[in-house]
Structures are given as structure tokens and as C-alpha cells.
């Protein structure tokens, strides 16, 4: 799926690169990144996903979604970013949720909910 369709309504802005690149997967775990993936750097409670940006690029990520500009600069200053699109997110957690929904064609919209209420 094209990156511009994946980041739709996610609060993201492309800072460097191409919006029309094809993305094969969306990951927030650098161990699961494959060539053609988009990596979302999420700040966690124990670790910061920004610390794994260079690993994701090394594994072939085509897009990096980041929240912290200073952290991005620290990790990519000496790397070759040819073919990598950098995308700034207001909230990487929100961006990840919206990107996953877009990538998988909004599966929650296709669910049928049934509620049964009553007493006893």
C-alpha cells in the first residue's frame, strides 16, 4: 500500500522523502522490521523506540515515523538515508493506531455488534 494512504488522518507530516513509496508492513518493533516496512518509533515506559531507528533503517525500513526530532537527529546523523522517508508525528502512538487501521482497511468498521440487555 502507498505511504500516503497509510498515513492519512494520522497527524503526520512528511519531512524528508517520497509519499508515494510502497510499504509492505507497519511495525513498532525493530526486530520485526523487514525490507519495505514502515517503522513507528514509540516512546515506551521502559525503552524509547527512537533508540532503534538506526536498526530499522539497517534492516531496510522505507519509512520512519518519529515524534522526537532531537532523538531522530542523534540516531541518523551519520547514516545514509537514501530511499528512506522521514515522517514527523504529533503522537507516535496515535499515528501507529491510525496507520494500522488504514493499512488493514479499517477492520473495526466491518464488525457487527450485538448487545443483549436485561435482568435475570
Where are these regions (language model features)?
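N-terminal leader/targeting and accessory segments in enzymes
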Residues: 1-98
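Walker A (P-loop) phosphate-binding motif
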Residues: 101-120
Amino acid at each position: 500500500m502507498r505511504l500516503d494512504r497509510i498515513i492519512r488522518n494520522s497527524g503526520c507530516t512528511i519531512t524528508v522523502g517520497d509519499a508515494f513509496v510502497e510499504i509492505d508492513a507497519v511495525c513498532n518493533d525493530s526486530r520485526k522490521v523487514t525490507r519495505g516496512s514502515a517503522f513507528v518509533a514509540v516512546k515506551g515506559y521502559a525503552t524509547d523506540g527512537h533508540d532503534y531507528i538506526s536498526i530499522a533503517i539497517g534492516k531496510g525500513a522505507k519509512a520512519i515515523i518519529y515524534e522526537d526530532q532531537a532523538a531522530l537527529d542523534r540516531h541518523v546523523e551519520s547514516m545514509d538515508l537514501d530511499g528512506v522517508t522521514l515522517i514527523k508525528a504529533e503522537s507516535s502512538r496515535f499515528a501507529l493506531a491510525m496507520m494500522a487501521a488504514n493499512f488493514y482497511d479499517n477492520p473495526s468498521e466491518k464488525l457487527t455488534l450485538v448487545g443483549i440487555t436485561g435482568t435475570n
